[in-house]
Amino acid sequence: MRSDIVKKGFEKAPQRSLFKAMGYTDEEIRRPLIAVVNSWNEVVPGHIHLDKIAEAVKAGIRLAGATPMEFNVIGVCDGIAMGHIGMKYSLITRELIADSIEAMVMAHQFDGMVLIPNCDKIVPGMLMAAARVNIPSILISGGPMLAGRVDNKVCDLNSVFEAVGAYSAGKITDEELFALEENACPGCGSCSGMFTANTMNCLSEVLGMALPGNGTIPAVMAARIRLAKMAGMKIVELVERDIKPSDILTIEAFENALTVDMALGGSTNTILHLPAIANELGIKLNLDIINDISDKTPNLCKLSPAGHYHIEDLYFAGGVQAVMNELSKKGLIHLDLLTVTGKSVGENIKDAKVKDYNVIRPIDNPYSETGGLVIVRGNLAPDGAVVKKSAVPPKLMRHRGPARVFESGEEVFEAILKGKIQKGDVIVIRYEGPKGGPGMREMLSPTSALAGVGLIEDVALITDGRFSGATRGACFGHVSPEAAERGPIAAVQDGDIISIDIENKTLTLEVPEEEIKRRLESLGPFEPKVKKGYLYRYSKLVRSASTGAILE
């Protein structure tokens, strides 16, 4: 076995001595050594309970006859990091997580690993590591938070963000804001809507890297603990059969993930993460593939922020496997792909049934005939931008309005709360891209403020940054090339007319090309905002959002 290099033979006596210093017996050392990669911490509500998940995983590993060895990686809470310098450090942890797992697994030569993430960047970071080191691996998440309730109405973290805008506009009282603060997040788990964390946890199931149920079983349910034990047992089988991520993560698996993403109306951040994971295996997911899949995939779900349902509702309606089964009725799912169950996708989903067609629409009666995400292009975004079409108000599907230009999320947040944004405006937030930020911050605070003050159906927002999965409205992110690379977004001036046409997938700055070129040439080279530390190194290495913001 792979771990023999650190334990077998007389010359490995020093290594065995170190294992024995931790209390491992000869029998435990002889067995397959399984890394349990945990992201537990006391900072993130989605991770506060992962110690319990890890204990269940380790119990499963021991039941199956192998030896678990746990180590930890970092995890950032995007919600706590939102709206300040801390958000610059969110996306960049994806690479730190992948790199640190690579280092630990290669240094200690584990036979397999179980990955325990839950929140936004931790899931893709761990999947990138699995693809990179390519040893038998399985992912088991912590599970979604339950939705909150105030006055018998469901709510979630996004409700609190939007309430800040409503409070500043005098639309709600101190008591109403406090009630949301107290009740929107009722306990552990990844925030309860189809936000980035839950989207990625659902897609890990679709990719075949997690067991059925991983994306939707609530964090507080005993079924989550049972699933963790099953994952611990399953990794030993994967090691015995030598089933690696490269056997599972094929181009067809990524096509399945994109298809389900479109059906669920998932987070726009998947357009960063799926290409980055694929890149680790030498698979290129370009933006044209994404649009091709979106064009033929019906949108079957409207979960928060696009609708009032939450992940627990999706779970009780049949979960991700039921969505896949529904999509397979029109031949939209590759069925013969291998998964960590040891069975094919088709075998996994054949008995999955939709239990509530209000939550999961039937394939012949979708919310729309095309997917929830769309890539748009035009002279403002030559290399593309992404919008969550399923969360855009109908009257903003096509829009033309004057640009209001800002250099940071904080500037526009303040302008919204002070009433400086008018109906019809097109907000442009630039120098928030991977290099320009650096770190490509999420713009949830500005979009939530727009919703709170009542402008979310009348104002569009365009940025080279990105959006939280909780964002709703006509919000275009990942504009590429970014302003720091002197993309056309750097040339926009206040009052320029911007045209949006989501159905035709265009984003147009109504300024002559010669004038755009003249403006860009007058800017000179971009001066980095950060001159030291990890952010500085990241800004030097990161590529465009159109590539998944990977490092090179």
Curated annotation (Swiss-Prot):
It comes from the Bacteria. Its cofactor is [2Fe-2S] cluster; Mg(2+). GO terms for cellular component: cytosol. Mg(2+) binds at D78, D120, K121, E442. Keywords: 2Fe-2S, Amino-acid biosynthesis, Branched-chain amino acid biosynthesis, Iron, Iron-sulfur, Lyase, Magnesium, Metal-binding. Its EC number is 4.2.1.9. Pathway: Amino-acid biosynthesis; L-isoleucine biosynthesis; L-isoleucine from 2-oxobutanoate: step 3/4; Amino-acid biosynthesis; L-valine biosynthesis; L-valine from pyruvate: step 3/4. It holds the Pfam family ILVD_EDD_N. PANTHER family: D-XYLONATE DEHYDRATASE, D-XYLONATE DEHYDRATASE YAGF-RELATED. Homodimer. Belongs to the IlvD/Edd family. This is Dihydroxy-acid dehydratase. It comes from Caldicellulosiruptor saccharolyticus (strain ATCC 43494 / DSM 8903 / Tp8T 6331). The lineage of its organism: Bacteria, Bacillati, Bacillota, Bacillota incertae sedis, Caldicellulosiruptorales.
